[in-house]
Amino acid sequence: MLLSTWTPGCFQGNKILLRSLITWYYLEFMPKLRPFYFLFYLTLPSCATDSPPISDKSSSIFLPLAQQQQLVHWMMPPRFRCQDYLLPLLLALSPAAAAAREVEYHHCHCDGGGGGGGGGLWSMDSIFRRQKVSDLLIAAAYFSIPLEILYFVAGLRHLLPFRWVLVQFGAFIVLCGLTHLLTAFTYEPHPFMVVLLLTTAKFLTALVSFLTAITLLTLIPQLLRVKVRESLLWLKARELDREVVLMKRQEEASWHVRMLTHEIRKSLDRHTVLYTTLIELSLVLGLTNCAVWMPAAGEMCLTHELRRDGGGEDGVVGVDDADVVEVRGSDGVKLLGPDSVLAAASGGKEEGTGAVAAIRMPMLKVSDFKGGTPEVIQTSYAVLVLVPPAGKSWGRHEMEIVEVVAGQVAVALSHATLLEESRAMRDRLAEQNRELLQARRDALMANEARQAFQGVMSQGMRRPIHSILGLVSMVQEEALAPEQRLVVDTMARTATVVSTLVNDVMEMSADSRERFPLETRPFHLHAMIRDAACVARCLCDFRGFGFAVHVENALPDLVVGDERRIFHVLLHMVGNLIGRTEPGHVTLRVRAADDDVLDDRLGQRWDPRWPSYSTGYSSVKFVIGVKRQQNGDAGSPLSRRPSGKGIDLRLSFSMCRKLVQMMQGNIWAINDPQGLPESMTLVLRFQLQSPLTSSSLGGSFEQKHSSPSCQIAGLKVLLIDDDDDINLVVARKLLEKLGCVVSSPPSGSGFLSSVGSSAAAFQLVMVNLEMKRVKALDVATRISQYRSGRWPIVMAMASDQKAWEKCAQSGINGILKKPVILQELKDELARILQST
């Protein structure tokens, strides 16, 4: 019913009204678009030609002319308002165009035929046909645009945020095409349904157009940002182009630097390096001349130049020159002025030359490359002067090339200096190597001499002394008179001291240092004093001295200490006193010292740190003094003055002091007015030994009347030693003295065959670890492999303490230290038999 009330004139008026409303909305909310909608408003009546002709007038829809003029004046920007005379003309044309559209076509006499009855080119029928074809083509074009958009835009994911805009735009285009398609059916008589569809299509087109315009409010700022971003990207591209140009220049400069560095480092001669630098720089930078000025004795001397005709007369510039001071005080390239003396001396004042540049080159020292704390060395600088041709200016890249090349030249010169120093060092090392080889040969010869000395000492002194000690120990077991026993015990103790001294000498020759090992064990102090007094009496009688000994009765007897070292020190004290003075009388006093603090002749205080006698320790004081005769018989054969030097005695006294200090004691001497020793005092602190353990005393030379153990008697012993001298005989006699049955192979090399032939014949094997032709440790190892059960027991004889540790790893049951003494042999055999 509503549709039936719509007439063509009413429909045309509503369309114009709708467009007016849309125009008002955009002009109200978007003032910047007023000029464009003004033009749209002027062309609005002419766009109505696609509507069918209507019979009634609809000019009442438009505003009056005055109001239309005001509306256009409001819509026009201020810059267009100056031309107000155009507004009446434009407003007059707009109603005329609308009126021409609203009248029926058969009242139009446009083709001159009137009524549209003519058949010319511009007849109404021809115009309608052309409009119909145009509408169909426009519709086809509109319909093809969405297809093209779908074909080209469907796969672009970055346009997904704009898909709603694309949908609206596509709908707008489709509806516009549909409007033109329906309009093509209105040029001929058509039913009302076509008009209704056309109206609906136009309404939807207007609605979609309105929505699309609203959507563009949010899209246009984004497009503007894209434009701004495009501008920024364009600026960034220009900056990148400039950076690429700079990078190319830097790459070119780097290539030149690498080439120059390669040429400079080809040689390690300083003159070749400098001349190569001058030549290559002149080729790369196109220089006229290059010069190198070296410091020498407060002046700068021209040492290297590309061409010699450009230098000064003498080629010398003072180091206090302003340009020289400025160049040497800066790191970069400095341009010299036109009045520079340095530039003139380098050929910079000639015709055809440009601005002269100069740079310093540090002359690095060899000590700069050595490790450790660097030395404070004043850096020396050379000056490189560059003379370009006329018209050439120094750019930043050229200056960078010069700076890098100057650094490379400094490094190359330092390498050349280092090479020269290394060559000199190589020569010195070669000389030192020759000296070391000579020292090595001398050391080998000294080692051979030392080994020969040790061999002579071992064969000529130690082995005979060991034999003497063994024989003396056998004599001690015999029934002797008291005087005889005193002499024998003294001989045994003296031989023990000599053996200890020989061992000390051999150890010092092997280790090249003084070593005095102590062997602390229980001993009888009274017997040791008695033997020392006996030897001292013999020495005094030989030198024409009288001798007396006084021993305190309260002196302890069983003490713990190293009796050999104490005996040695006492003999040294006696020898030192009687060796430097005229004949007189020697007195030996031995007493228990008090616990108070004792002072020596040097004022040094020695405070015993051990407990008193009642707590198990006792201090013993030995004082040996000499009283010279006023009128000695110089012609007596017993009065002989030794010819020893005082320095030797002082050295010997120093060694004795060291021994005493190792035993936690002290020793000092008192001299007379002539500087000769008058008395010597020795203070020692001993640990007391309980009488219950007197049976464990070792090394005592008193007579033992106990008979051999029943286990030792009849023991079958195999004695292995490749030496056929007196030592083997003494060892055999000692074992036979204890009641053992002793056998020995012909040599050490035949030992294994003896063991294989009579495996159960021996109960004990004694091996000498100091055999020459056979390694005793290998023999002991083979014995431990062949034996089974409790056979045989292995015991080794050695004088070297280092060999004792190896014996425990080789399966040796016991160690007997040389010299072999009867009582020690008996005690060791008893211990081994008891433990196994």
Swiss-Prot record:
Signal peptide: none
Catalytic activities: ATP + protein L-histidine = ADP + protein N-phospho-L-histidine
Keyword Membrane among UniProt keywords: yes
Main location: endoplasmic reticulum
Subcellular location: Endoplasmic reticulum membrane
Descriptive protein name: Ethylene receptor 3
Source domain of life: Eukaryota
Cofactor(s) this protein cannot do without: Cu cation
Organism: Oryza sativa subsp. indica
InterPro entries per record: CheY-like_superfamily (IPR011006), GAF (IPR003018), GAF-like_dom_sf (IPR029016), HATPase_C_sf (IPR036890), His_kinase_dom (IPR005467), HisK_dim/P_dom (IPR003661), HisK_dim/P_sf (IPR036097), Sig_transdc_resp-reg_receiver (IPR001789)
Enzyme type, top EC level: transferase
Domain Histidine kinase, first and last residues per copy: 457-691
Note describing how the cofactor binds: Binds 1 copper ion per dimer.
EC numbers for this chain: 2.7.13.3
